[in-house]
């Protein structure tokens, strides 16, 4: 959803106010119109007070845009007696994303991050460990359901994630053999350098189960991979 005067990619959704814990809460809930609400389901605030939860009347701005307001990077390079250490950090700030995806005009969609066995996939460990049960009423996540649960699939502040991150994008450590040693060794080489390198080594972010650089939750994005390499660079002596 894009509105005049609002940031491109601003997230709109329902304001979650907790999980249903008592029969009184269920008896006095506003009409949601998607599924049957049970204990452990997400409660939404009736913003306009009409007794119904609707897109036109109750969706509000939640979080920040899905496009970072701030992108930053830091490049470092250290040299000492033939040794070299270089690093590239990059990150983003003032950005949000939701775990429930963006199908159905951004209003609702379960994903592998919000429902176990979604589309025949696996069940995230964190959902199983910290979902609502009668013995775990202070859970971080709503009750589990192996089938579609429309009430818990809505875009809402419940599934909002802080998208800020800092990533060690590239790290390289190497050593260049001094030319006088190569000349003395008389091995026909004028330059020898060996180094090890890695990419995407560390990421500091609030929600560790997603790649914070992904374009969208349910768009088939394959997370960036860690890579390690060890290289030897040589150049022959001039004739």
Q: What is each stretch, according to the model?
A:
Residues 82-86, 180-181:
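Repeated loop/turn-to-beta-strand initiation elements of outer-membrane beta-barrel proteins
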Residues 1-64, 117-136:
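Conserved small-residue
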Residues 73-75, 170-174, 229-231:
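Membrane-embedded beta-strand positions in outer-membrane beta-barrel channels/transporters
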Residues 70, 81-83, 164, 188-192, ...:
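Outer-envelope beta-barrel architecture signal
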Residues 6, 10, 92-193:
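Extracytoplasmic gating/loop element in the C-terminal half of outer-membrane beta-barrel translocons
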Residues 233-239:
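Conserved small/polar residues in nucleotide/adenosyl-binding loops
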Residues 87, 194-196, 232:
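Membrane-embedded beta-strand positions of outer-membrane beta-barrel proteins
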């Amino acid at each position: 959803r894009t509105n005049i005067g609002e940031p491109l990619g601003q997230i709109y959704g329902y304001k979650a106010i907790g999980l249903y814990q008592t029969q009184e809460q269920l008896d006095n809930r506003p009409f949601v119109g998607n599924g049957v609400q049970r204990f452990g389901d997400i409660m939404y605030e009736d913003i306009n007070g009409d007794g119904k939860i609707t897109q036109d009347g109750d969706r509000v701005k939640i979080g920040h845009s899905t496009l970072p307001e701030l992108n930053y990077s830091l490049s470092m390079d250290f040299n000492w007696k033939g040794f070299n250490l270089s690093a590239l950090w990059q990150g983003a700030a003032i950005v949000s994303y939701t775990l429930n995806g963006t199908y159905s005009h951004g209003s609702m969609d379960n994903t592998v991050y919000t429902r176990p066995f979604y589309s025949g996939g696996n069940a995230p460990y964190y959902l199983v460990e910290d979902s609502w049960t009668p013995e775990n009423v202070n859970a971080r996540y709503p009750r589990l359901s192996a089938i579609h649960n429309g009430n818990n699939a809505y875009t809402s502040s419940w599934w909002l994630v802080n998208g800020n991150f800092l990533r060690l994008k590239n790290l390289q450590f190497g050593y260049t053999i001094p030319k006088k040693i190569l000349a003395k060794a008389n091995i026909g080489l004028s330059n020898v350098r060996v180094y090890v390198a890695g990419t995407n080594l560390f990421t500091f972010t609030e929600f560790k189960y997603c790649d914070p650089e992904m374009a969208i939750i349910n768009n088939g994005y394959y997370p960036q991979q860690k890579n390690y390499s060890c290289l030897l660079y040589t150049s022959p002596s001039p004739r």
